[in-house]
Amino acid sequence: MTAYYNEIDPFAAQWLRNLIDAGHIAPGVVDTRSIEEVTANDLKGFTQCHFFAGIGVWSYALRRAGWPDDRPVWTGSCPCQPFSACGKRQGFDDPRHHWPSWGHLIKVCAPHVVFGEQVASKDG
């Protein structure tokens, strides 16, 4: 089985490829499309799916915690800018608000384990 990494930033996507090649994160495929373009069919056959993958911190952390690469899991760290003070708090009107797309994929694919995170801002 293999992992799916979704990351639109070209620099971060290349880092993912480098880390995969070096064996530091689960082997897999890096998809640079927007999550809004990803369908449930695109995810068939992947054991792990990492959305907003950045430089593979979820895959790395799971390995460090003893989570095997062949154990199914979905992870994601949605962009915080739509709701953060630094991001001007445009909320649901912000084009970076991608939770609905990820939530839809979770609903349709129904993975057994999903980990997500969102950091709190310094102002709460």
Where are these regions (language model features)?
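Conserved active-site and SAM-binding loop architecture
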Residues: 1-124
